[in-house]
UniProtKB/Swiss-Prot annotation:
Cellular component annotations (GO), alphabetically ordered: peroxisomal importomer complex; peroxisomal membrane
Protein's name according to its UniProt entry: Peroxisome assembly protein 12
UniProt keywords, alphabetically: Membrane, Metal-binding, Peroxisome, Protein transport, Transmembrane, Transmembrane helix, Transport, Ubl conjugation pathway, Zinc, Zinc-finger
Ranges in the topological domain labelled Peroxisomal matrix: 1-5, 63-102, 194-238
GO MF terms, alphabetically ordered: ubiquitin protein ligase activity; ubiquitin-protein transferase activity; zinc ion binding
Gene3D superfamilies, A to Z: Zinc/RING finger domain, C3HC4 (zinc finger)
Subcellular location: Peroxisome membrane
Domain of life: Eukaryota
Gene from which the chain derives: pex12
Membrane topology: Multi-pass membrane protein
Organism: Schizosaccharomyces pombe (strain 972 / ATCC 24843)
Keyword Zinc-finger among UniProt keywords: yes
GO biological process: protein import into peroxisome matrix; protein import into peroxisome matrix, receptor recycling; protein monoubiquitination
Amino acid sequence: MDSPSLLEVLQVQQVEKLISPSLRFILAYFTHRYPRFLLRAYNSFDGIYLLVKLLLEKSQLKKWNATSVERRFQLKRVIAVRDSSIIAEEFPQESESATSLNGIDVLKKLFLTYCIPYLLEKCESLTTVKENHTAVSILSLQARDKQKGALSVFYSKIKILLVRLKKILHFVFRLIRKSNTYLQWLYYLLYALGKTPYTNLADHILRQRVIYNVENIHSRKLISTREKSSLLTSIADHSMEGFLIIIQLIDWWQSNNYESHLKKGEVAFTELAPPKLPFEINVSTTDICKICGEKIKNPAVLSTGFVFCYPCIQVWLQRHPFKCPVTNLELSRKGESFWRLMI
């Protein structure tokens, strides 16, 4: 099983993190125009988003063994099994059924990935609200103790304990969030070094890993016929896919700052004569990777215009920096020499 690179994993997580702020911004824009109808929905955005996200991702995981963003990047989830590649070659059907997610795996994935972060965020926000008033509350309660009887003193002490408990809980939640951030970077490092097949703690607990969905790449017609089985599911899938494409385009445009380049008249193109190829191109070789010699999987295009397997061109550029494997020409845009094709 071919695992995606760390760059692809980070890209998936980046797009995943952009969904909620983008939807919140859109809702805030329309709430400003129609507050009477949308203000209540905007105030309850986190809960509504979690509910819709759970319903959508549950159907995606059951149907495709992947979340909506992972499916967009042609990835899928499998249960980690020892010597899975050897078992897949000898017993392909048994291996596929053994590594596919069942209903319990889907529910555990949803709970760890979406519900727990939501609960931690809400608990931290609830304790943060009272944190600024902690000192004032304790002093005011202690002042009232001197003026009231024993029963009121008892209640005041309980309130003081609750205020201090909230302060401790707020510190604990912040510590958990920071520890999770450091642990996430540790998983990134181990994954990049090939020491673990998991990209985060939740996947490690669930024993789920992410791999390329080769079947999804080479069987578009089968997918399109399966999607027509449910009209509502099909509409949700296509709407989500279109929304993700828009998010990626906006993020790509802003991160590359193309607007300022266009205003300044800066052009990143290099005028080169057509290269002389060392082989004759025909119909039978157009879908063959020029590096591994096999049919192209997970296509990626180089700045010279040739298409290769995404893992192949990554390894090639690490061994031969800024050189095209076909033309042997130096790449003009060394910072962004190749792009993955989403077809």
